[in-house]
Design a protein with these regions (language model features):
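Conserved catalytic alpha/beta core of Sir2/sirtuin-type deacylases, generalized to analogous enzyme cores
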Residues: 1-205
């Protein structure tokens, strides 16, 4: 009721209330709500089958949302299968994994970046990330990338030898991200739950 009341609160709360209504409509939609099209697949003309077809829900987020506490909300949505796929930036992937390896700290927007940098600390808004966090991330990621390259090369070698059934194999960004989610083994992670629940993550940037 609180969220719905925003629609009549005024200012930007109104658009938030409208967004709540749109999310409700998106989650409630079924193909059975729509008239049957002339070119509809035969199996989708069955009312029972149409009632089972839901909207495919994409969630898009930028890296700053993962750097901040919003990460926990995004993780919850994937853990409980509230979305069908996630679209994020490279920073969104990196920040999620880095938080599994070492904590970020609360700071202040007024802290001087140059002074922090001299101490080996990076600032994201009012969040502080020690250089060590990036080192830990690199140490964790590099062996996995080497392993993935070995898998691709092994597949290419089998093809070159003409082995029966051999096919070239390449990691797509989504399959790389899924492997990271499988390897991180941390229930606080967005990538962990995406991999566990087979929810694809697309990273065009």
């Amino acid at each position: 009721k609180l969220l719905l009341s925003y629609a009549t609160t005024g200012f930007t709360a109104t658009t938030f209330g409208q967004a709540v209504e749109e999310v409700k409509r998106m989650r409630a939609w079924r193909l059975s709500d729509e008239p049957i099209a002339d070119d509809e697949d035969e199996h989708l003309k069955d009312p029972a089958a149409r009632a089972k077809v839901k909207a495919t829900i994409f969630l898009g987020c930028t890296s700053n949302l993962v750097s901040a506490g919003t990460r926990e909300t995004i993780r919850w949505l994937l853990e409980h299968r509230k979305v069908d796929c996630l679209v994020t930036t490279g920073g969104g992937i990196e920040e999620d994994l880095m938080k599994c390896l070492a904590p970020h700290y609360m700071g202040d927007f007024a802290l001087k970046g140059a002074e922090l940098r001299a101490k080996g600390i990076n600032r994201i808004g009012n969040l502080l990330v020690p250089n060590r966090s990036y080192c830990l991330f690199e140490d964790w990621l590099t062996p996995m990338l080497d392993e993935m390259l070995d898998e691709q090369n092994a597949a290419a070698s089998r093809v070159a030898k003409g082995e029966p059934g051999a096919e070239p194999f390449f990691f797509s960004p989504s399959s790389m991200i899924k492997r990271m989610g499988e390897k991180i083994d941390n229930k606080d992670s967005i990538l962990y739950w995406a991999a566990k629940n087979d929810i694809p993550i697309f990273c065009p940037a």
